[in-house]
Each structure stands twice: as structure tokens, then as C-alpha cells.
């Protein structure tokens, strides 16, 4: 009984920390309806929700990740929290140096993880230059 309460508190603490860090950037909404805590991040990121439900003597915690909105982060937009695959085609996430989506301009080195800007191509798969 103590361990399930500890798990619920741990999940609630992690969720609260995620919501606070997300709220600081102004892109999240937290809704508390009768102790059911839901977090929603709109726009270019997915929607996550955490629900703490009271089921008799036990509390059950479910962390759900809803479907992605099929949107991506474009040039100069933050990719923090959405990972390298969250940038639009033709862009890569500069994580951890700046955590924004970028593309490689003409004449600069490129490769599989550093894609050229629209209209340009890389002379090599792993290593080359944008032309």
C-alpha cells in the first residue's frame, strides 16, 4: 500500500515538474478537474496527459501520450522536448548546443544528421558539402 502511494506521488511530482517547466515557456495549459490533472501542449508538440484516478482504496496512475498532431518544428523553432525527429523535413535539431531546428546553408559541411536547406543537396551521405 505504501509503495503504490509512493508511485502515485512520484508520478504526480514528475508531472508537476514537467508542467511547470513547460508553463515557463508559455506553451502549456494545466487543467485540474476534481484531482484529475491534465496537461496539454498545443501547436507543434504532442499532447500528453496524466490522470490520477481514485479507485476505492487504491490510487492508480496512468500516463498517456496522445497522438502527435503531425506537425513539425520549422527553421529556428525549438526542438527541445520533441527530439531530432520533431523538426520538419530538411531541418535537424541542434541539440544540445541550442535545441533549435536548423538546416545547413550552401557551402557548409553536411551529412546524414545535418541536412542541407531546401533546394540544396549534400555531396556525401555521412560527410559532404551542401551544393
From Swiss-Prot:
Gene Ontology MF term list: sodium channel regulator activity; toxin activity
One CC-aspect GO term: extracellular region
GO biological process: defense response
UniProt keyword Signal, yes or no: yes
Subcellular location: Secreted
Domain of life according to the entry: Eukaryota
Disulphide bond pairs: 72-88, 79-93, 87-101, 103-117, 110-122, 116-130
Tissues of expression: Expressed in trichomes, that are stiff epidermal hairs located on the surface of petioles and leaves.
Propeptide: 25-69
Keywords: Disulfide bond, Ion channel impairing toxin, Knottin, Neurotoxin, Plant defense, Secreted, Signal, Toxin, Voltage-gated sodium channel impairing toxin
Function statement: Plant defense neurotoxin that causes pain and systemic symptoms in mammals via modulation of voltage-gated sodium channels (Nav). Potent modulator of human Nav1.5/SCN5A (EC(50)=55 nM), Nav1.6/SCN8A (EC(50)=0.86 nM), and Nav1.7/SCN9A (EC(50)=208 nM), where it shifts the activation threshold to more negative potentials and delays fast inactivation. Also shifts the voltage-dependence of steady-state fast inactivation of Nav1.6/SCN8A, but not that of Nav1.5/SCN5A or Nav1.7/SCN9A. On Nav1.7/SCN9A, principally acts by binding to extracellular loops of domain IV (Nav site 3).
Protein family membership: Belongs to the urticatoxin-2 family.
Name under which the protein is recorded: Beta/delta-urticatoxin-Dm2a
Phylogenetic lineage: Eukaryota, Viridiplantae, Streptophyta, Embryophyta, Tracheophyta
